[in-house]
Amino acid sequence: MRPIGTRTLRPRSVIAAISALLFVPILAVGAFAAAGGQSQLDGVRQATAAFHDVDAAIAAGYGPFYVCTDENGGAGAMGQHYVNGDLVGDPAIDPLHPEVLVYEPMPDGSLRLVGVEYVTLRSLWEQEFGSATPTVLGIDLKPIAAGNRYGLPDFYERHAWIWRPNPRGMFDDWNSKVSCRGNGDPA
């Protein structure tokens, strides 16, 4: 039996809509720091550095999902998500292989990598690992119920703003320093 949270990268058929998703906030910075989080973050940055080039992300199997997600209550934005369906279809969570790359649209039409998101479908996770809550980087993933804005079944998610500081916290869903205005979406 594989330890919880390890991934064997094997393709699985996944409903196209499932291959992306989302995010909801949680603050656990104290637990993260206690777990030696900075070296883990450095590893995630190294593993995702090539994806500053969106074409490299696309070549690696990531693609745009949903619209750039902006919050009207002043919380900021989640940005534009590029999802890797094969990784979403694998229930394991591997910090070095995030299921989602998060980009901020820039005024010139380019995209700037600002973070990553970890996503697993609840049904796949529980089938493989049981009812324990998945974790990544020492932080629990947040459960998101079916009936969500993305039209997905129950899933777990966690954002990590590794490329753009977030005044709301490293693992909050919303980043008040990120905007969707660069691509014409309403602010």
What are these regions (language model features)?
Residues 12-16:
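Short, hydrophobic alpha-helical membrane anchors of single-pass surface/secreted proteins
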Residues 34-187:
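Primary mode marks residue(s) on the alpha4-beta5-alpha5 output face of response regulator receiver
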Residues 17-28:
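Bacterial N-terminal signal peptides
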Residues 1-11:
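N-terminal secretory signal peptides that target proteins for export/translocation
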Residues 29-33:
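Sec/Tat signal peptide C-region and signal peptidase I cleavage site
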